Structures are given as structure tokens and as C-alpha cells.
């Protein structure tokens, strides 16, 4: 497959998934933990907006801050599709002549830059589909082409912090491709549920927390020793959160690490507060969670002794 065709098809694959995002999904979590659906779309739209000046010889200094901040406006789908169309047109016009482009790390061959763009569109297209319940299937031909290009670059990208740790191989070409880019090929509703649950606790938002738990949820508190206290049902669990956030001085939960495996999740956290005398306090612990259809049905908490 020639490079322009590869690029064109990966951008179209991305655009198809953008076009399917519903109005109520823009704030949802994605496999890119720091980005919402809108953040992810803005990132790729920014790449598309940068493509034209870079492929036509502009330097980073000449472009300046033109593409900083929000690029999506009131119509994120249209903004993203317009940027994608312009980028496709530019690459088709400029790639045949070859040459170099000016990137953040220096001058790079145009072919290499376009390969980078193709990879980003393909992987982020999957990210977007996973986040929005879209079509997770990637074109096997595109997966093969990008995976072949990436094989000699994977460790370089990982060492530079561009991608996360590699996930375990799956034996499936698409799964192994995503794992190489630091993606969990099984990312789905439970991962999204954990991200929302952690964010709700971080915000101290009891209503948001309870909206992410089942009506028959169970919470087992750490204390008192040795077995803690078991709270059953949404009403009982809600009362615990109301007391926790209402009676604690400046409560603040911070996620330190999390992962999901099937219907189970683990969330490692730190809880900070301020005592009545103004002195700070904190404790660190772990939640072992069980999910049902993306909602938390069990939360068992364990605190460092």
C-alpha cells in the first residue's frame, strides 16, 4: 500500500468515528486517561490543522500558537471533519515531491512524518470508538501497514514517553497492535466506569458517585478492625459518603493507580483532610471493586495499617 493511500484511509477511519459521537458523549472518559472524548478529538484535530503548514515548509516558530487551545468550538464534529479533509488534500498534493518537515525534535523526512500521522489516526480512532461504544474493528490492512512501520520504533517511542507500557500480547493482530501502543484491547464500559467513579470521588460529588453504583451496591469500610463495617444498598452507602464528605475538613481523594480486569477493578488512592486544629492528615489505601454493566456493585476498601 502506498503511503498516501495509507494516510488517507487512516484519516477516513478516524473521521467515521468522529462522525458517530453523540452530543452527550463529549465529556466521557477515553483509553487515554488524561483526555475526555472532546480532548482526544481536539488533539487529533490539532494534528490535522498542523499538517498543512508543516507539509508546506513552515517552521514551528512561524506557526506559533495558532493551533493552541480549543479548536472544536460549538460544532466539534464539523470542526474535526473540516480539518481532516484539509489535511488529506495537503498530503496528497505535497507527499509525492518528498522532502523534510520541521518537527519539535528537529527536521524529519516527510515520509516518516506522514507515517506518524497515519499511526496516530488509526490508534486514536480505536480510542474514540472504545470510548463512545463505536465500531472497534480496525481495517486489517491498515493495522498490518502501521504495525510493520512501528515495529522498529516501538521501544524508542516508549523510552521517550510517547506511549505507555506495552500490554500483554493477545495473539490477535489487532489486539497485539493496540498492546504495542500501550492500549488495553479490552478497554470498555468497566474501564470507563472506573474512570468516572474515581473522578467523582476526587470531586467529592456524592450524587455523581451514587449514579455510578448499582441500587444493590455493597461497601465494606476498612474499620473498625478486624473486619470493618459492611453497608448494603444504595441508601446505606450514600449515607456513608454524605458523612465522609460532609463531616471531614477539606476532604480530597487522589487516584494513584488503577486497572481493570474483566468485572473487577483495583483503585489505589490517597485521602487527605484537615483536622479541626488545622493540621493536615492523610491515609493511603486500595479499593477492590466489582462492576456490573459499567456500574460499581461492590467496593471493598483496605487502608495501610
Regions found by a protein language model. Give the residues of each.
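Short, solvent-exposed alpha-helical surface patches in non-cytosolic proteins
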Residues: 38-44
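Hydrophobic alpha-helical core bundles mediating ligand binding, dimerization, or RNAP-core interactions
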Residues: 11, 84-91, 194, 201, ...
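A solvent-exposed, acidic/Ser-Thr-rich amphipathic alpha-helical stretch
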Residues: 206-210, 214-262
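Hydrophobic pocket/interface hotspot
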Residues: 14, 40, 197, 209, ...
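A beta-strand edge to alpha-helix "cap/lid" segment located at domain peripheries
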Residues: 238-305
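Short, low-complexity N-terminal intrinsically disordered segments enriched in polar/charged residues
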Residues: 188-215
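Structured surface interface patches that mediate subunit assembly and partner/cofactor docking
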Residues: 1-16, 20-33, 49, 53-192, ...
Amino acid at each position: 500500500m502506498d503511503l498516501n493511500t495509507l494516510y488517507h484511509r487512516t484519516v477516513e477511519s478516524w473521521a467515521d468515528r468522529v462522525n458517530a459521537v453523540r452530543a452527550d458523549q463529549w465529556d466521557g472518559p477515553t483509553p487515554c486517561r488524561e483526555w475526555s472524548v472532546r480532548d482526544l478529538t481536539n488533539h487529533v484535530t490539532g494534528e490535522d490543522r498542523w499538517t498543512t503548514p508543516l507539509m508546506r515548509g513552515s517552521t514551528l516558530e512561524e506557526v506559533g500558537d495558532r493551533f493552541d487551545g480549543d479548536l472544536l468550538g460549538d460544532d466539534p464534529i464539523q470542526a474535526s471533519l473540516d480539518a481532516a479533509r484539509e489535511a488529506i488534500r495537503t498530503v496528497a498534493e505535497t507527499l509525492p515531491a518528498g522532502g523534510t518537515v520541521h518537527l519539535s525534535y528537529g527536521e524529519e523526512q516527510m515520509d516518516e512524518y506522514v507515517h506518524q500521522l497515519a499511526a496516530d489516526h488509526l490508534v486514536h480512532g480505536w480510542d474514540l470508538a472504545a470510548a463512545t461504544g463505536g465500531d472497534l474493528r480496525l481495517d486489517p490492512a491498515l493495522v498490518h501497514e502501521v504495525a510493520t512501520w512501528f515495529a522498529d520504533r516501538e521501544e524508542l517511542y516508549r523510552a521517550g514517553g510517547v506511549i505507555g507500557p506495552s500490554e500483554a500480547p493477545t495473539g490477535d493482530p489487532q489486539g497485539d497492535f493496540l498492546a504495542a501502543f500501550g492500549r488495553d484491547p479490552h478497554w470498555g464500559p468497566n474501564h470507563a466506569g472506573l474512570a468516572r467513579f474515581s473522578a467523582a470521588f476526587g470531586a467529592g460529588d456524592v450524587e455523581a458517585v451514587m449514579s455510578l453504583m448499582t441500587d444493590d451496591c455493597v461497601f465494606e469500610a476498612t474499620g473498625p478492625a478486624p473486619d470493618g463495617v459492611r453497608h448494603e444498598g444504595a441508601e446505606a452507602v450514600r449515607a456513608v459518603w454524605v458523612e465522609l464528605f460532609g463531616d471531614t475538613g477539606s476532604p480530597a481523594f487522589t487516584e494513584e493507580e488503577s486497572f481493570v480486569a474483566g468485572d473487577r477493578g483495583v483503585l489505589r488512592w490517597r485521602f487527605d483532610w484537615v483536622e479541626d486544629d488545622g493540621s493536615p492528615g492523610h491515609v493511603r489505601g486500595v479499593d477492590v471493586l466489582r462492576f456490573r454493566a459499567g456500574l460499581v456493585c461492590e467496593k471493598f476498601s483496605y487502608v495501610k495499617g
